[in-house]
C-alpha cells in the first residue's frame, strides 16, 4: 500500500503502527521517525522562515481573516505517486494541511488522482481522540490487532504517570508573543502529570492571554511549549518572557522550556511521553535531557 502523510502526527502514528516504510511522501514539518526522512516532501508553508513570534502571529491572523490556507500541497508529486491512502487532519487550519485543502488541490477537473484514493482525516482533541485516530489508521491499513497491542502498552504507561497528585499550579503557554493558553489535550497532560492546570481545562481551545490573565491564574510555575518549536528555541522564548513576567506582574516562580514538538504540539502518543516529562520537571524538580530545561533568571 502506498501512503502519503501530510501531517507530522500522522507520520508519527504510522511509525508507531510499524508502517513507516509504506510512506511514499511526507510533510515539510515531519522530523520523526528518522527512517522516513528521506522521503520527498509533499507540502510547504506560506510563512517565511526567520520571523519573530509576533510576526508569525500576525501572518497567521491575516491568512485566517482572508480565508487563505497556510500550507501548499504538491499536487504534481502526489498525482505521480498515485497513493492508496492520504493522511491529513481536520482539527486546525493553522497546524497543518486540512482535508478541504487536499480536496481543492487534488480533486480538481484536471487532477489524475484515482477515485479509489482514500483520504483519512485525523481530528483528535484528547488522548481518547488520539487513540481513535490511531485505530482509524489501523482500520484503513488492516492492522487493528497490532494496534490493540500498541495501545495496550501506551495505556499502561499513561496510567502509571497519572498515579501522582500535587496542588502545584502550572501554566503552559503555547505561544509567548502574544501569550496563548494551553488547549485540546495539553490541560489533560498537566492533570495526568499530577499538576493543576492554572489556565485551561481538557478540551478547551487555546486563546490569547494578557499579563493580567496570567497573574489572575496564580501559577506556581510556567512552562514554555510554543507550538512547532524544539527545546532550544523555547529556551530563548522563555528567557525573553521571563523578563516581562518579572517586570509586569512580579512573577518569580519556576519557568521551564520544553521540546514542544516531541512532548506537546502533536496529537500522537508522544503526549504520554510529554506528561512524563512534565511530571519529572515540575513535580520531581529535574530537567529531562533534550526535553526540558529550567530558565535561569
What feature does the model see in each segment?
Residues 1-297:
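N-terminal ligand-binding lobe of clamshell/alpha-beta domains
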Amino acid at each position: 500500500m502506498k501512503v502519503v502523510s501530510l501531517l507530522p502526527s500522522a507520520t508519527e502514528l504510522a511509525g508507531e503502527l510499524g508502517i513507516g516504510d509504506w510512506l511514499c511522501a511526507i510533510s515539510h514539518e515531519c522530523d520523526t521517525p528518522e527512517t522516513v526522512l528521506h522521503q520527498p516532501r509533499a507540502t510547504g508553508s506560506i510563512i517565511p522562515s526567520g520571523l519573530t513570534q509576533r510576526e508569525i502571529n500576525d501572518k497567521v491572523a491575516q491568512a485566517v481573516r482572508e480565508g487563505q490556507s497556510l500550507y501548499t500541497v504538491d499536487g504534481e508529486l502526489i498525482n505521480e505517486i498515485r497513493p492508496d491512502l492520504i493522511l491529513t487532519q481536520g482539527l486546525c487550519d493553522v497546524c497543518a494541511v486540512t482535508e478541504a485543502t487536499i480536496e481543492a488541490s487534488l480533486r480538481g477537473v484536471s487532477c489524475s488522482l484515482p477515485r479509489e484514493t482514500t483520504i483519512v482525516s485525523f481530528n483528535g482533541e484528547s488522548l481518547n481522540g488520539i487513540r481513535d485516530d490511531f485505530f482509524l489508521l489501523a482500520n484503513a491499513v488492516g492492522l487493528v490487532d497490532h494496534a490493540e497491542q500498541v495501545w495496550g502498552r501506551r495505556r499502561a504507561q499513561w496510567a502509571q504517570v497519572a498515579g501522582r497528585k500535587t496542588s502545584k499550579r502550572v501554566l503552559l503557554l503555547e505561544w509567548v508573543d502574544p501569550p496563548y493558553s494551553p488547549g485540546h489535550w495539553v490541560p489533560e497532560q498537566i492533570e495526568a502529570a499530577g499538576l493543576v492546570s492554572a489556565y485551561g481545562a481538557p478540551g478547551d481551545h487555546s486563546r490569547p492571554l494578557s499579563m493580567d490573565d496570567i497573574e489572575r491564574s496564580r501559577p506556581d510555575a510556567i512552562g514554555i511549549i510554543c507550538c512547532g518549536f524544539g527545546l532550544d528555541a523555547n529556551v530563548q522564548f522563555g528567557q525573553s518572557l521571563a523578563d516581562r513576567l518579572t517586570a509586569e506582574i512580579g512573577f518569580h516562580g519556576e519557568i521551564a522550556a520544553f521540546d514542544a514538538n516531541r512532548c506537546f504540539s502533536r496529537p500522537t502518543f508522544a503526549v504520554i511521553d510529554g506528561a512524563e516529562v512534565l511530571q519529572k520537571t515540575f513535580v520531581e524538580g529535574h530537567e529531562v535531557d533534550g526535553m526540558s530545561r529550567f530558565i535561569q533568571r
